[in-house]
Swiss-Prot record:
Name of the gene: CBP60F
Taxonomic superkingdom: Eukaryota
Region annotation (DNA-binding) ranges: 154-273
Biased composition (Basic and acidic residues): 12-22
Subcellular locations according to the entry: Nucleus
Primary localization: nucleus
Transcription regulation found in the keyword field: yes
Name the record gives this protein: Calmodulin-binding protein 60 F
GO MF term set: calmodulin binding; DNA binding
Key words of the record: Activator, Calmodulin-binding, DNA-binding, Nucleus, Transcription, Transcription regulation
Family: Belongs to the plant ACBP60 protein family.
Region spans: Disordered: 1-22
One cellular-component annotation, GO: nucleus
Biological role stated in the UniProt entry: Transcription activator that binds DNA in a sequence-specific manner, likely 5'-GAAATTTTGG-3', to promote the expression of target genes.
Amino acid sequence: MENSMNNRGHGHNQEHADNLPESKRQKLPALASVIVEAVKVDSLQRLCSSLEPLFRRIVSEEVERAISRLENSKSTSRSTEPNKIQGLDGRNLQLRFRTRMPPHLFTGGKVEGEQGSAIHVVLIDANTGNVIQTGEESMTKLNIVVLDGDFNDEDDKDWTREHFESFEVKEREGKRPILTGDRHVIIKEGVGTLGKLTFTDNSSWIRSRKFRLGVKPATGFHIREAKTEPFAVKDHRGELYKKHYPPVLHDEVWRLDKIAKDGALHKKLLKSNIVTVEDFLQILMKDPQKLRSLLGSGMSNRMWDNTVEHAKTCVLGGKLYAYYTDQTHQTAVVFNHIYEFQGLIANGHFLSSESLNHDQKISADTLVKTAYENWHKVVEYGGKLLNCLPVAKKGIKSLPEPKMAQNHQTQQKALQCQQTVNGYSSDPQHLIEYPFVQQPCYQLRDYTSMESSSVSGSYNGGLEDIFTEEIRARSSEMLETDNMQRLLKTFGISGGFGNRDESIYGFSDQYEAQIDKGYMREGGRGAGKAVVGWLKLKAALRWGIFIRKKAAERRPQIVEID
């Protein structure tokens, strides 16, 4: 009977379930969703189990660090040591590093400062900033230690010795001491230099991944310790791939920042025949857009800026290149070792790129573009120093016209002549070497004639248009000054400077007679005559430089550029 009642009840329940609407029936989960849910739970459990040791270690380190700092602060408050470390006479003594550290060092290599410099430490009085050169403290022995890169207290902030030592890094278990070599330094007269030191372990195993060097007194003097900037120490195997700061021109291009050796960017550059830093800089100056397009999207704009900035710190050589705009080689565009525009040479004058005015810059831009397009015509500059050429400040208004080529040829032939003035040759090569005699030979020939107050008629006739009233007035003012009159009177220089009208220069017959008498009185002394000769030559050269400058200013310099 009981079974029949159960069967009847079960049938009733089944009938009731069949009568329920579809939305109210209990849905069973699909097999796929069950599997996905199980995989998610398993993955989450694995992730938690892998992260748990990491979290425990970080929390443990931070708790230990906080406890140690709390204990140090308590001991400091209880101690009688003052906030500022005082010397025997009340001075605030501090150690300071005078050398900056490079961003990277390598194990097994010598510990050096930036660009291979020695590392210096000094003892100063923080109240005055002066180096302590006297007293017992100025001959202190110091211990060199390795600090954690997290020691970020400012140099002007006071800390205790215990606080400083809490950041010292000890070697790992089973490893050699982190720093080997001369771990002590003795300062003499307040200055000391670190000896040979070597790191035996890298800095990747500590949280900051960087070390600092620190120094502290080995004796009982109250001197505050010093620390360097943080730096990374890498395994010596990475030294083969390290970057150079600054790079040199013959370095391979992967020595630049953001370009990895044998990486995608390096391969692109090699494919375009850009092998060295010099090649990189030259194409950067000639066509930066082409270089940027070559590197493509694999180098972001920020990476590009870093690479270019690093490349431009390269130390350049003294090689110069010139693109001559005419056959007479009187006008040229000058480039440096990496094809960067430096300035213009026009009519024997050098105009640096910074000194060009607006119109000259427009003309120069056109010439630079032409030079880059015809780079096969660019030649190495002939070894003459640009700083030996006269610098045109305002006399040259633009580049000379090509129509003036014939005049340049005539002037060049005049420059090729050889004259000797008191034993000094006037060859153009010598004129480049000595800027104060950068005059053409026909002018030097005129200088020698000043002693006898005679000038050839062809010279005066050829330059009649140059010696204008402005130059005559200016020369008269120069010669009429008290200093010039006294100089001429003292050394007996004749008043005829290439013009038969003596009144132009303010000389009178009476004054000439005085000069002649003074000169005759000193004529018997050989040394006096030698001095007079040199002073006459010096005055003549100065006069010629003034005349040539005025002549250059008066010469037309108009040019039309398409």
